[in-house]
Swiss-Prot record:
This is Putative helicase 022R. ATP binds at residues 702-709. Residues 658-840 form the SF3 helicase domain. GO terms for molecular function: ATP binding; hydrolase activity, acting on acid anhydrides. Keywords: ATP-binding, Hydrolase, Nucleotide-binding. It is an enzyme of class 3 (hydrolase).
Amino acid sequence: MANATIKYTTMDLYGILKSCKCSSDERLTHQSLSGGRFSVTGSKVGEFWRAVADRIESGEPIDISEARQKETPLTLDFDVVDKDCKEPVPDVLVNNIHAAVARWARSSLKPAPEDRDLCGVVLTKPVRQCAKGWKKGFHIQYPKLVLETGVAKNLVVGPALRPICSKVWEAVTGTAKDYLDPLSCTVPWLVYGASKPDEPFAWKIARTLDHAGKTIDFNTAFGDVETPPSWGRPTSDRHREAMVLSIHPAGRSVFFRRYDFTAANPGRVTRLADYSAVMAKLDVARQRKPAWNTDATKAHRLKRVTDLTAMLTADLADDRQTWLNVGFCLWQQTSGSAEGYKVWLSFSKKSDKCDEDECWTIWNNQMRPNSFTEGTLVYLAQKHNPGAYLNWLQVKSTPVNDIGTNVAMAKIMWDYYGHQFVCCGGKTQTWYRFDGLTWVESNQGTDLRSLISAEGGPLRRLLMRQLDAVTAAKARGGRDSGNEDDEEDSATDEDDSNPWDSELRRLDSEVLDTMVKRLRNNLKGIEMTGVKNNVLRECAELFYQPEFGDVIDSDPLLFAFANGIYDFREGCLRDGRPEDKLSRRAPVDFVMFGPIPKARHPDNSPVMRPKRMPGESVQDHARRLAECFEQDDVSASAGTMGKEDVESFSCNPNDFKGPVTKLLAFFASVFPDEGTRRFFLRNAAATFVGGNPDKVVLFWTGTGNNGKTVTQTLFEKMLGCFAVKMSTQTLTGRKPSAGSANPEMARLGGGVRWAVMEEPNSDETINAGTLKSMTGNDSFFARDLYCAGKTTFEIKPMFKLHVICNALPGIKDADQATWNRVRVVPFESTFVTPGTTAPADAKYVFPADTDITRKLDRLTAPLAWYLVYCWACIQNERVKYVPPPKVMEATMAYQKEHDLFRQFVEEMLRKDPDSTLTCDDAYTAFRDWTSANSPHGTVRRPKGQVVKCLEAILGKKTVDGWPGYAVGAEQQE
C-alpha cells in the first residue's frame, strides 16, 4: 500500500507539470533540468508543493528548478573546489560570512532590516570528488530579504558582497578566494530537495543562523512567515521548509518586506570588509584558545541555566514580573529553543498559578531578543537561595592539574562573584561591584580582594574541600593498583560531592604530596598580601569587560532611585538588575503617592501595516495603506487609550492630596501665573528621562528674593549625584584646545540629568557654539584631569541645561538656531521676610518662609512621584503643546535685546520709498555700528554672513539691494 502511494505521488507531480507546459515565448515559473518549461499558477501551485513534499519525504529524486522573477530573495552560491583537502568548509568560516552579510544588509539596505529579517539558511551537500579536486560548496539563503533581481545582480552580489566574503575567507583560511558566484541571484534555483540529473545528492539544510551568526531553530527563525492560501497548508516540516525556501515571488513576495538597495561607496564597502575580517580572526582565535572550562559550549550552558533555574524558589514563580524576567533570560540564553522552554515550564510549575497554554503562547509569540544574561539567574539564586548556590558551586569541577594554583583560585572567585564584579579600563583598572541595585565603583578591587580571605567565604571552603579530597586519595595509597577490589572501592567512594576522586586515584603519591603542600600553603597564603595580590591579578583577566565603561549609565529610560529602578519603558518601579548597567542613584525613595497612568510610549505601540491580500491589485493595496496612515495619524493625536482613560496633565494643588498638594502649593507661590507654572513643570517632567529631545535651555530670570535658589535646591536634593553645577566658564569661556583637559565637561557624563550654570557676571557672554553643542543631543569628547589622550571618552548628553541669573547674559554670535533653543522663564514672585518691604514694582508678593530649607527634604519624594506622573500624562496628550505667551514674550524680548542685526536695523536704517539700500552700504554701516556700540562685536563678520542675516529681517534682496530702505535714523515728524 505504501509503494502504491509513492507511485501515485510520482505520477501526480509530473502530471501537474505536464498540464502546465508552456512554449518558449511564454513566461515560465519552473523548468526541468532534463528538459521542459512550465508555468505553474493558480490552483496548480498548491498541488505542486504537496507533490514536491511527498517526493522529499519518500526520497525520490527531483530535477525541478525555479526561474527568477522580477523580485528574488537574496541567495548566495559558493562554488568551492579544493585540490588537496577533503574536509568540509569550517563552520566558523560560514558563520562569519553570514555575519558579514548581515552587517552589510543592516548598513546598506533601506529601510534597515530588523534582526529577525537577517536569519540565513545554510545548505550543503556531502563532500564529493571531481576532476578538479574535492567539491564542497555551500549555499546561504535569506528568505526574508527580497530584492529586485536586477539590483541584486548588478549592485549587490558582485560589487558589494563578493569583496566582503573574500576578505572573510582570507581572514579565516589565510588565502583570499572569490568563491561567490556573481550570478547567484540570476540563474534558476533548485527547488528544495531537488538535484541535478548527474548528481545523486540534493542540497539539504545544514543549520539556520540568526543575525549574529549563532545557530537557531528553523521554525523559530521563520515561524512568522506566511504563505498565500493558494499554496495550501504545509503537512510536514519538509513541506514547510520547501515553501519557505522557494524563490518564487508570484503571489508570495507581498508577504515579505522589500528592501531597496542604497548604493554604498567603495570606501565604505572596503571598511566593512576589513571590519568583518577582523571579527572573523577574533572568532577563530576564540575557538582555538585552549580553555579548561566548557562554559562556552551549548550543552554546558544549558546545564548551567537548568541548574540555576532549579534553585529559584516558588515565591519567585508567584511574582509575575520575576517569572517573566526568568523566561526572557532563558529565551535569550537558549536562543528560544525547546529545551529552554522546558526549563522555564518546570520553573513555572512551582507556582499554583501556572498555565501551560499561557507559557507556550508567551514563549513563542512574545519573547524577543533582550539584554538579560546568565547573571540574572545567578543573582536571583544567590539572593533567594544562597545555600543551594554554594553547594552547586562546590560540585563544579576544577581540573586536577590546576588544584591549588592562583588560576584555580581566581576561577573559584569568578564562579561565585563573576556577576557581581566587573573590571574595565586600560592601564588604570577600574572595578565595579553590583550592590543589588546599581554598580558601585570599588577602589582597585578592594571589595573583591577582601572576599579572597573572608572567613566562611567560597574560596576558603572550596580549598578546604579540595584538601580533604587530595588527603583522602593520598591515604588510599596514590595510583590505583588495578585490582578489582580497588575499582569496587572507587565506585563506592566516588560521588557527586567529590568530582576529582577518579582522577586523583591515578596520580602518584609524590604528585599528591605536592598538591597537599600547595593547598595548605594557599590556605595560609590567602591571608597574606602577596598571594591575595596575585589572585586579584588573575581575577582581573577573568572579570575584564573592556566595553563596560562605555555602556554604563547609557540607557535614557532607566533611572535609579534609592529603593529601586524606575523603568520608563514598562512604566513601573522594579528591582535592580546587573544588565541595567547603572552606577548612579538618587538619594530619595520613589513613593507611590497615587496611581501613574500607562504612558503611550513608542516602544509599546508598534504600528501594524495591512498585508496585500491574494488577488488584490497594487493600486487597491496602496489605497488601503493610505487609509492605515490616516488612522495612525488619528490614533497618534488621540492616543492609544480611550478618552475616558486618558488622564490630563494638571498642576492645580486642589487636584491632589497629601504631600503632593503641599508641593504644588509651593510651585503655585513661585509661579503664580498658571501658564508659566505649567510650562516649567512640563519641562521638569522629563528630568528623569535622558536626553533633550526639545533641544531647549531654560533661562531662569528675575530680580530679588523670588524663589530661584530654593527651586534649584529642591531639585538638587531630589537628584543628588544626577545634578551638576557648572562653572560659568563652561558656557562663557573659549572652547578648550584639542587634547586639553576639560574637567567641567567631563563631569557631564555618566548619566547626569540636570546641569545648571548660576549667576554669570555682567561682563560675561555665552558662546553660542558651546550652547548649541550642549543642547543638540550630539555626543562630545571630554578629557578629565590626569587622563591620557587614549582614555578620552565620548559623552552622550543626558542632561537638561538650565541657566539661573538675575540679568540675562548676552549670547555671542547668536543665530536663529540659537534663539530657537532659548526659553526664558520669568520668576515674578517676591518673598518678603519679616521687617522688610517688597519693591514698588513687585507683581506678586508672598511672605517668606524662613524654615523653607528644612521643609524641602519632605518635598523631594512628592516631587519625584509628581514628575513621573506628569511625564506619563504628557505622553498621552493628543494636542501639541504651545508655550504660554508670557514665556515666548520674555524670550522674544531677550532675543531683541541681544540680536545685533535687529538693533542695527532699528537704530541705523530708515524706510525711504525712493531709496535702495545696497549690500556694500549695509555692510559698511553695520561694521561701523558694531565697532562703536557692541561690546562683543569686535569679531569681524564676513560680508556674506551680514547680508544673509539682514535678509532674515528685511526680506530677500534684489540685484541692487533692498528697495525702500536707506541708511540713517528715522526722521521724526
